[in-house]
């Protein structure tokens, strides 16, 4: 049975801003996760002249059942892409830049060196802070080290859901491997802020969400995002429930009590939604 979408999840799309930003990105030959994942905040973010750049193409090597990004055989890396991302950030006047990627299990380092090159290019821009949302690199510690040594301000890696639902929601991923990545970042450089996020509405319980929060705090994760899972198409896993704004507020309060420096919890919250604000609050 299909669960009806509530009023609090209906958003107005600002088509003029959307069209303008999409034309700019097309001209720069760049992808955003905003477009590839059909993000509900795309109109608002594009109106604010912010976007999350998605590097290493727009085809993923995994088949997570919640994700709208295309699956298949990716193209070779574009060596000029890191420079173009930095140029786009400069032209848009961005002060905080978020970079993510598809998962590239076909590459020896999972694309870590490409992330590092992009971070180095962005760090050339005066006063710019950089946040990266990385895949799990199949647990490759050298790959994680490569990204850490490029010194982004924030390294985000989403655990996405509670452990019980992994086999159904993201069968090629591993909950412990994801926790270990975030733990390794802190071991290598305690000054880098770490961040993770989950979707709710997939059939998890409140107790399971709280356990994930505790697991993240146990590895000194600084920031957390919690948002509603929205089904991209009939091919994707169904929504089990639409979590109320009141429950999201409760998760936020619990997160702060557990010691997170910043918690963004709401129906439309996504990993990089108002990430600049999150960084500022986390730094105090």
From Swiss-Prot:
Q: Name one Pfam family in it.
A: Radical_SAM
Localization of this protein: Cytoplasm
Keyword Magnesium attributed:
no
Q: Which residues bind [4Fe-4S] cluster 1?
A: 34, 39, 45, 272
Protein name (Swiss-Prot/TrEMBL): Lipoyl synthase
Binding-site residues, [4Fe-4S] cluster 2: 60, 64, 67
Sorted alphabetically, the Gene Ontology cellular component annotations on this record are: cytoplasm
Q: Lineage of the source organism?
A: Bacteria, Bacillati, Bacillota, Clostridia, Thermoanaerobacterales
Name the source's superkingdom.
Bacteria
Please name the CDD domains in this protein's record: Radical_SAM
Kindly state which keywords UniProt assigns to this record, in alphabetical order: 4Fe-4S, Cytoplasm, Iron, Iron-sulfur, Metal-binding, S-adenosyl-L-methionine, Transferase
Q: Where is the Radical SAM core domain?
A: 46-261
Give the species this sequence originates from.
Answer: Caldanaerobacter subterraneus subsp. tengcongensis (strain DSM 15242 / JCM 11007 / NBRC 100824 / MB4)
Q: SMART domains per the record? A: Elp3
């Amino acid at each position: 049975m299909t669960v009806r979408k509530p009023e609090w999840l209906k958003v107005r799309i600002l088509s003029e801003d959307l069209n303008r930003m999409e034309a700019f990105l097309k001209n720069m030959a760049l992808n955003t996760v905003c477009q590839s994942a059909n993000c509900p905040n795309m109109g608002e973010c594009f109106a604010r002249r912010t976007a999350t750049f998605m590097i290493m193409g727009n085809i993923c090597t995994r088949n997570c059942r919640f994700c709208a990004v295309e699956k298949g055989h990716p193209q070779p890396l574009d060596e000029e892409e890191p420079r173009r991302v930095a140029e786009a950030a400069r032209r848009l006047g961005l002060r905080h830049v978020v970079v993510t990627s598809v998962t590239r299990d076909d590459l020896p380092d999972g694309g870590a060196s490409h992330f590092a090159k992009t971070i180095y290019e962005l760090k050339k821009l005066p006063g710019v802070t950089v946040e990266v949302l990385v895949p799990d690199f199949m647990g490759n510690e050298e790959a994680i080290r490569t990204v850490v040594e490029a010194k982004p301000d924030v390294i985000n890696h989403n655990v996405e859901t509670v452990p019980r639902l992994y086999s159904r929601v993201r069968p090629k991923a591993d909950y412990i491997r994801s926790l270990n990545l975030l733990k390794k970042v802190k071991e290598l450089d305690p000054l880098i802020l770490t961040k993770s996020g989950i979707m709710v509405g997939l059939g998890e319980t409140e107790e399971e969400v709280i356990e994930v929060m505790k697991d993240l705090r146990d590895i000194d994760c600084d920031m957390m995002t919690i948002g509603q899972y929205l089904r991209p198409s009939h091919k994707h896993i169904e929504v089990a429930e639409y979590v109320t704004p009141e429950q999201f507020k409760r998760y936020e309060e619990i997160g702060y009590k557990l010691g997170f420096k910043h918690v963004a919890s709401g129906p439309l919250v996504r990993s990089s939604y108002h990430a600049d604000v999150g960084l500022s609050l986390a730094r105090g």
